[in-house]
Amino acid sequence: SLGSVASLEHGLTVDGLARRCLGEFGRVAQVYGSPDAPVRRAAFFNGSLGDNGEDALAAGADVVVCGECGYHRALDLLTRGCAVIILGHDTSETPLVGVLEERVVELGVSPKNLLCLGTEPLWHSVDG
């Protein structure tokens, strides 16, 4: 099932959306698609895209933003007119960490018994 779908502002491009993700999450995304391709509708999935690419296409998405997407799945979406922005699994779930923490405390778990991981990067990239 689809995470969420949004209609985006006029004039936004694939790279423009990827740059917004960088600004929000502070992590460089892997992007499949033409940098200047217009984005009108986006599908968002936290964690892995899994088999939800078909749902994104059916919803009319020009781009999928997700945490993980296999290479061949990304190529399939790309050849069918849908760009893919891959944030990293952990990065895509970071916005939910605080929400889940609050809910667990509401259910009676003491905050002193909670250890939340995922708010700081646990991995890094090496280049050059």
Name each model feature, range by range.
Residues 1-128:
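Hydrophobic structural segments
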